[in-house]
């Protein structure tokens, strides 16, 4: 099996890691950062931007820049709450009730999985550059409380990115793998994962390389962004009260509020008060309007009591499901940037006596765990075993709309469970199997995963036919359902695909489009790389010219300096004209000119101790000007050469013994 990377696909930031020599290693992206913003955008020229490049245009181009996409993956429109839909770009429901993201500049609507695939593709490309070989497979982490729908959609995003998702791994489990893969002592671990858009808590026992998940719980619509939103609303309401304008109705102003809120939240983790300055945020009848205020930690915490309550309940539920008490927990592992907030850490201290572990990086630990799982799959790590659980109950709808649970939540996976059902009416020739996921008693209150029909049942009185329904969950937490008529042996099975917001035809069409445009994408990327390289070289040339002027004076290397200046102007002109074909030749000329200048500077540095250096610099420059056709190649300051028989030779002429004026 080839190289498999671990990918933490986060709401705010994403990370990729790989196992090298038995140790997980986080891979820096092309911009040099270990985390990549989970942002996708299109420039005004409809050029795809991913990561930091996309994030830079959030304020200036909010309609065509998309963040917090993870909250939309695998979810229907009716599942979204107001906070998730409070984004500067346009989201709407399509005819099937799925979320679609509208892009103004491309005049297209995108499924969230399409945009998320661009993030995965960038992470994989950066990993391939680091490793020096293609990466075609990955372990992708998801929140533990992701349902089957969201897991299927994540797998689809991987397919659209052109990779095989070898394993869907729960984020808290990945964090525990990173924390405990090289520890032998038995520990009971609570993983508290508060990311940008989701929240999970898992309890597991770690001992001698065995990771046994006992219980998991969470909220896929709660994260650090919700805390940001409280600051946004606080600022917007204060501004509205003072000026009568609601900044949340202006896309650019809203994005500036979001960025200021995130910055204030982060700073309040280290200080008690932070200033918030947003000049020219709006325009009123009397001119520009500004926000100049400050936010202190008590005020911020006073905005979020209900959010803290929502963090508390899953922890208590997981403890109850595991059969543990808070005193049984040995270690607390914090995951996600949201766990840096003092009020979150204080909440944990009121629940669990153990101090949170500070030995892991909350932003990177999940990707590191993904790399460990990749090592398990490839056989590089042979002494580790992971026993995960399903986060939500799975069942089917029975008479009266009740939900019959076949696989309760926190059941270890992989697992197979079956039960026998019958018909509700006489002479019923078919039955519909409707699969649901959730904890409510009525099926309609849970999440519908899909349905299929088993036909060909022989006529019989009500309750006589026997239909065996089996649920299979694989190690990825993905579900397959089958139904068998025991009388005829007729069988119908289905891989539940209801979670994906793209059907198979749409997926294949997008894959074909991506393949068709792969060459164009590569050419566009190569063009961008050439432009960036040329700009970098121009910057180097400007610095080198300044160095030469300081070290050698105005005439020390005049010919070489003039050659660099000429070549540099050619490159700049071609960059303005966007003539990439000629640019390559101009860059080569500039490199050659820089080489000549660098050689001259190095030569002067080596002989800098010579007291005649200044004179030699000037005469050398004059020589270059007067004899640039190379008809004076010898250095006049050097002694004449001697032939093999001892004769003295200068410029190809044998010297007479009386030519002493040639000697120094």
UniProtKB/Swiss-Prot annotation:
Keywords: ATP-binding, Chaperone, Nucleotide-binding, Phosphoprotein, Stress response. It comes from the Bacteria. Transmembrane segments: none annotated. The modification Phosphothreonine is found at residue 198. Pfam families: HSP70. InterPro entries: ATPase_NBD (IPR043129), Chaperone_DnaK (IPR012725), Heat_shock_70_CS (IPR018181), HSP70_peptide-bd_sf (IPR029047), Hsp_70_fam (IPR013126). Coiled coil: none annotated. One of its GO terms (molecular function) is unfolded protein binding. Induction: By stress conditions e.g. heat shock. The keyword Nucleotide-binding applies. PANTHER family: HEAT SHOCK PROTEIN 70KDA. NCBIfam families: PRK00290.1 (NF001413), PRK13410.1 (NF009946). Acts as a chaperone. Belongs to the heat shock protein 70 family. This is Chaperone protein dnaK1. It comes from Prochlorococcus marinus (strain MIT 9313).
């Amino acid at each position: 099996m080839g190289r498999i990377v671990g990918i933490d696909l986060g709401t705010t930031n994403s990370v990729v890691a790989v196992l090298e020599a038995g140790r997980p290693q986080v891979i820096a992206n092309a911009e040099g950062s270990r985390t990549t913003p989970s942002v996708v955008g299109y420039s005004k020229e409809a050029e795809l931007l991913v990561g930091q490049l996309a994030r830079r245009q959030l304020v200036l181009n909010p309609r065509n820049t998309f963040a917090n996409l993870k909250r939309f993956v695998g979810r229907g429109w009716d599942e979204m709450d107001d906070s998730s839909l409070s984004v500067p770009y346009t989201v709407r429901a399509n005819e099937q009730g799925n979320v679609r993201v509208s892009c103004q500049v491309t005049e297209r609507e995108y499924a969230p999985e399409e945009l998320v695939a661009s993030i995965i593709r960038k992470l994989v490309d950066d990993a391939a550059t680091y490793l020096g070989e293609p990466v075609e497979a990955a372990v992708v982490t998801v929140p533990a409380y992701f349902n089957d729908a969201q897991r299927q959609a994540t797998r689809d995003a991987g397919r659209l990115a052109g990779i095989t998702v070898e394993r869907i791994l729960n984020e808290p489990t990945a964090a525990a793998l990173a924390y405990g893969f090289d520890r032998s002592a038995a520990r009971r671990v609570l993983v508290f994962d508060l990311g940008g858009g989701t929240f999970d808590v898992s309890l597991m026992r770690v001992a001698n390389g065995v990771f046994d998940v006992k219980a998991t719980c969470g909220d896929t619509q709660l994260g650090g962004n919700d805390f940001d939103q409280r600051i946004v609303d606080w600022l917007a309401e204060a501004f509205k009260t003072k000026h009568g304008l609601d900044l949340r109705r202006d896309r650019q102003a809203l994005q500036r509020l979001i960025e200021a809120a995130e910055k204030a939240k982060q700073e309040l983790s280290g200080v008690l008060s932070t200033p918030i300055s947003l000049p020219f945020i709006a325009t009123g009848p009397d001119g520009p309007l500004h926000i100049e205020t400050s936010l202190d930690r008590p005020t911020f915490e006073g905005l979020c009591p209900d959010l803290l309550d929502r963090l508390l309940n899953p922890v208590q539920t997981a403890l109850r499901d595991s059969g543990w008490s808070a005193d049984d927990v040995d270690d607390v592992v914090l995951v996600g940037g949201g766990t840096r907030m003092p009020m979150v850490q204080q909440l944990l201290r009121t629940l669990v006596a153990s101090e949170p572990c500070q030995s892991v990086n909350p932003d990177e630990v999940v990707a590191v765990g993904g790399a460990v799982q990749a090592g398990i799959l490839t056989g590089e790590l042979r002494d580790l075993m992971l026993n995960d659980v399903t986060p939500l109950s799975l069942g089917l709808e029975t008479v009266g709309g009740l939900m019959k649970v076949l696989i309760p939540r926190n059941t270890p996976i992989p697992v197979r469970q079956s039960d026998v059902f019958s018909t509700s009416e006489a002479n019923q020739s078919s039955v519909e199997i409707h699969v649901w996921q959730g904890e409510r008693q009525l099926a309609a209150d849970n999440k519908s995963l899909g349905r299929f029909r088993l036909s060909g049942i022989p006529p019989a009185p009500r309750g006589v036919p026997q239909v065996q329904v089996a649920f299979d969950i694989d190690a990825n937490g993905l579900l397959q359902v089958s139904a068998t008529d025991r009388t005829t042996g007729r069988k119908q099975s289905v891989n539940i695909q209801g979670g994906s917001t793209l059907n198979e035809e749409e997926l294949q069409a997008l894959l074909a489009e991506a393949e068709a445009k792969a060459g164009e994408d590569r050419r566009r990327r190569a063009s961008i790389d050439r432009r960036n390289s040329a700009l970098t070289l121009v910057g180097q040339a400007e610095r080198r010219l300044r160095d030469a002027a300081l070290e050698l004076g105005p005439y020390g290397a005049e010919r070489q300096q003039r050659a660099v200046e000429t070549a540099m102007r050619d490159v700049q002109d071609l960059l303005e004209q966007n003539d990439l074909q000629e640019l390559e030749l101009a860059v080569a000329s500039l490199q050659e000119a820089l080489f000549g200048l660098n050689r001259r500077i190095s030569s002067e540095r080596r002989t800098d101790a010579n007291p005649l250096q200044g004179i030699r610099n000037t005469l050398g420059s004059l020589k270059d000007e007067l004899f640039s056709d190379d008809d004076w190649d010898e250095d006049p300051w050097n002694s004449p050469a001697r032939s093999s028989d001892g004769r003295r030779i200068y410029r190809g002429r044998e010297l007479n013994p009386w030519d002493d004026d040639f000697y120094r």
